[in-house]
Amino acid sequence: MLSLVFSAMTGLVGAATLAATLSLLVLLTAAASARRRPAPISAPTLLLAVVVPAHNEEAVLVSTLKSLNAQSYPAECVEIVVVADNCTDSTAAIARRLGATVLERTHASERGKGYALNHAVSHLLIQPVVADGFVIIDADTVAAPDFLQQISARISQNTDPRGYGAWQGRYGVLNAHDGWRAALMTTAFDLVNHVKPLGRDTLGLSAGLKGNGMAFTRALAEVLPWPGGSLTEDLDYGLELARRFDLRVQYVPEARVQAQMPATAEQAASQRSRWERGRYRLVRERALPLLGEGLRRRSFLLLDAAWDLLMPPLAEIATLLLLFLGLTLLGTATYLLPHPVFWLSAAGSGLLGLSVYVFGGLRVAGAGPEAYAALARAPFYALWKFALLFTDWKRTPKSADEATADEWVRTERIPQADAAPTTEIRHL
């Protein structure tokens, strides 16, 4: 009986982690085979509204707006709109000084990025001249000089008969050299924000929205308002695109943005805590209903979205694979597992597959030596992350109302010197 229970437990852990690893390898294979799309030569020039949600961002907003003002795109075709949401600093004044349209918003309870974006897009949709596309850039972000050109070209190539379209640019790290945490985030972003969406896009699936460097057509903005009270408003919006319109998010790796990441333990804990609380709440509330709806509608797009929600993050997959290996070794030593060669082979294959994904993915992403070097810190990061999750477990919001209260509890920023990300994208 004990052997049966132990085998079932080991098999459950192994099946889940091996399925996740196989999924990552499929995406890596697709990403590695993706063809580089040549930059458009004579794409139509569209009117774009660039929305920058900001809450007390005076330390970093100058670099963001300078990068947007320096775009290789006709200035008369771009309106930069900064939403100064519940600000108590000079964010609004800085934005006006640098030529942006400023929408100042104050609300006692509806606070956060989602509400700010909803306010801005609603305002822009009722203007006499409405933009062809809406672009969302975070206030701590530097956009590559050709970012808007690449986004505009993709919008102009949209073939959806309804005019609906959503795109995600390549979202990377601006301060990769500010300590090992930022360096490791660079490595993670190469895998999560480039390899996975590139693979999904190549397979005809939704690349997903990452919250920064996103773009939407006017037609889509008119029928689907941006969600307000959510810590994961970008993920929620992407899921609604699939549910309501059978629409996938397309990936534009040539359109690059880079944002500041935490460099200290305190900053990292604040950001990671918010991200993980939002993600787990989203999984709890939406994954199984989405899976059921996908089965009822026979929609592979919805089934893939549900699977993506259920699949653990990379650190958790690695930890579970090590747990699988540990259970296998224990079961082999105590004779609780039959056919030990099978179990050991499965555990070894999982770890090998994950290693192939990580190192192969970094090669596809064109990562530099610092990205590989940062992997040496990954075990310490995983331990820190699980300790943080355990600490936060009892504080996880049980409802959207609870989550809303800390949406603008943002990470402290480090003032950045003027910078711009490289536009070069290296491929295999």
Residue ranges and their predicted role:
Residues 1-44, 358-364, 385, 422:
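N-terminal membrane-anchoring/stem segments of glycan-assembly enzymes
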Residues 62, 89-96, 104, 146:
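Acidic helix N-cap motif at the loop->helix transition within catalytic regions
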Residues 84-92, 107-109, 142:
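A conserved acidic beta->alpha catalytic loop
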Residues 46-49, 79, 236:
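Cell-envelope/extracellular polymer assembly enzymes that use nucleotide-activated donors
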Residues 66-77:
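Short, acidic, metal-binding catalytic loop of nucleotide-sugar glycosyltransferases
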Residues 29-33, 40-42, 308-395:
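Membrane-embedded multi-pass helical conduit in multi-pass membrane proteins
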Residues 128-142:
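Short beta-strand-to-loop acidic/aromatic patch adjacent to the donor-nucleotide binding site
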Residues 106, 110-127, 145-230, 273, ...:
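Long helical/loop segments within the catalytic core of UDP-sugar-dependent glycosyltransferases
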